[in-house]
Amino acid sequence: MGDTMWALVFDRSKDEWAKSRGLRKQQVPRPHLDVSRDYRDSGEVIVKTRYAGFCGSDRGIWFRRAFGDMMAESLDRERKDVRVVGHELLGEVVEAGPEAERDYGYKPGDVVSTESHIICNTCYQCRIGDNHVCETARIIGISHDGCFAEYVKLPAQTLWPTDVKKIRPEVAALQEPFGNAVHACTKVNLRGKSVAIIGCGTIGLFAVAVARALGARQVIGVEPMEAHIRMARALGADAVVEPSKRTESSYVHDAAITAELLRLTDGVGVDVAMEMSGSNAALNTAISAVRRGGHVIMFGLKSGDAVIEQIDKVIVEGITLHSVVGRRIFETWHITRNLLESRDPDLHDLIWKVILDEGRGTVVPFAEFEPESFERAIQVHPKVLLRF
């Protein structure tokens, strides 16, 4: 192995954030372990990337809609200009530091995925078990070099052993984003419940399948895109409500969707409404459509302020709002593994056949990466993988 490797990067010495888009494929230094120079390398691992998934946050970076400040601050701290992007990984360990081998058991040849949040283990949240909201967490591919590269250097504590005899590698590369849906769907007990999933993008589609697998009595999607409507139905949605074009204020709930969700639940409202789109109006629609005493799960992310209509309804009707970020480390990963390794129901094959379309246009060889065609792919498919 040489001293350089190919990677997809944001290079601020060549591209001004506000005036550019996409990622550059260029050679960067290949990561190495050298405990004699940096004692922290003892707990690090070098992973050879096999598959890397393109996430919604990567889309935010590609189109310069999100994470610019976080990336700039981390590059300033590291005194460099290039950030290797990407955090959804399946790879093979090629080198492990002494501590990584002794304390975590990693050795060359092990197949792993990774949690995308590098936690400190010392802040108050980490010490009480809420490490998924670590105070100083770094995010792989944003504030730490990521996996859109031939090799990636990661702390052993973030890695997750994966059996590719039980989970096909393309699906195994999606454990991290799939875990977002698992976290959302385990915030409350869904067994026997009616669930509305507002926004059937990638994580929303995962949530449809997970909610069904976890025993939801009724799963209803809300989604405008025809292709995603078909996928939601194929993944187990009993019904999918298609919103109409609207001219109202950006935060006002959709009365037509609310009426349809009430009709589908005999006028009661859904037990659980999941807002997966990041739309202020969708959040208010979720609140308006949930039953008295019900739960609203907020996963969709949008920066800035939001307006909640009729806050008195939330209080008087006993509606509980839950926010979801990332995955509970590593509780969610254990549930994810069990769901994907199970063959009843076969979520594994549903993901491969429905979301990844058995690799047709969704698995792109890294060697053939070309910005224009790749951008078309990420706009057509809910999930795209790079194969190394």
PLM region spans:
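C-terminal hydrophobic helical "lid"/dimerization subdomain
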Residues: M1-D3, N284-I287, F330-F388
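Glycine-rich phosphate-binding loop and adjacent beta-alpha segment
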Residues: R233-A234, D238, E242-P243, N280-D346, ...
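Adenosine-nucleotide cofactor-binding segment
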Residues: I197-C200, R212-L283
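Glycine-rich beta-strand-centered segment in the early N-terminal region that forms part
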Residues: P31-G53, F67-Y124, D163-K165
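N-terminal Rossmann-fold NAD(P) dinucleotide-binding loop
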Residues: G204-L205
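NAD(P)H dinucleotide-binding glycine-rich loop of Rossmann-like/cofactor-binding domains
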Residues: L75-H87, C120-I198
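A generic alpha-to-beta junction signature in SAM-dependent methyltransferases
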Residues: V188-N189, T265, S277, A289-R291
